[in-house]
């Protein structure tokens, strides 16, 4: 693409963004990140993924202007700010913040071992490693994790359906070991209560596990759809489970009965990126029936699932964030993949997204009905 054409494309998109975003902040990291994780309502953690060098772990504060209720024009802080930082000798492909603490847990996606880090506090700006957790013997890399508020910090982790365990981080003690022969790779883990969690498999199966019993997990098979080689899953605190397949099929269930499909659709998402870890499917925590999907193109798509029915029909996005795709046109003549995505836990329509070109965007989108 010629420079003049690229400049016109950027100008057109920014003019359009004045009508479609309440807020939009564009930031360039020094390194691409595969993870974004909230450490508070105004701070995120990002990390590098370079197999041949040390990788930064950074805690960033979001622009204060984003959270200014009134007179945003008078708010001086309009940029991201590094609060704490450290280095990992290994790439970081998975990261989980432990709620109620200053601890994060990381995995390099090469082994199943975990590294535990302290993010620091007011008296120190250094992120330091405090301990390690050895993974299951023979377990592959690419650990998935889930965390919950508990008296002692703990994390649920595993790579396959048969090697999931709950570990207390202060002692390294295994609090629970899943009794299952399932060898399917996991795409995510989700607590649905203090005692029950769901293990989502790459083939679309869902394992429901009650940690209070030694009974084997309940298996809910994948939806029956054509050409769906891989599935990604999310569970909403508002009571919905969604599975999206590599062919663009989406199915919504009640987490208490994941085998029963309540409604489904065919998404206008296109083909997924060649790297499965780039795909993200996330319910909006502060909105009913709204889900964000990324990794199928250079855009983040927002869908309203409330209109979906028991029989699948084509569904078109309510909103698309094309900022990463537009801004990447100069580099390689094509869009880059969005490889991580996060909704704000309380701000209704605010998301953070990052792409493989190291771009980091924070954006608050406007619903079409609000723009009239």
Locations of regions flagged by a protein language model:
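Structural hallmark of WD40 beta-propellers
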Residues: 42-46, 101-106, 150-157, 194-199, ...
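Amphipathic alpha-helical protein-protein interaction segments
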Residues: 22-29, 50, 81-88, 157, ...
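Per-blade loop-tip surfaces of WD-repeat and WD-like beta-propellers in eukaryotic adaptors/scaffolds
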Residues: 63-74, 113-131, 152, 159-186, ...
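Elongated alpha-helical scaffolds
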Residues: 89-109
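Canonical WD40 repeat/beta-propeller blade segments in eukaryotic WD-repeat proteins
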Residues: 31-38, 90-97, 136-149, 181-192, ...
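Beta-propeller domains
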Residues: 1-27, 37, 41-85, 107-134, ...
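Loop/turn-rich, solvent-exposed surfaces of beta-rich toroidal or solenoidal domains
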Residues: 274-312
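Blade-level signature of beta-propeller repeat domains, shared across WD40, Kelch, NHL, RCC1
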Residues: 338-372
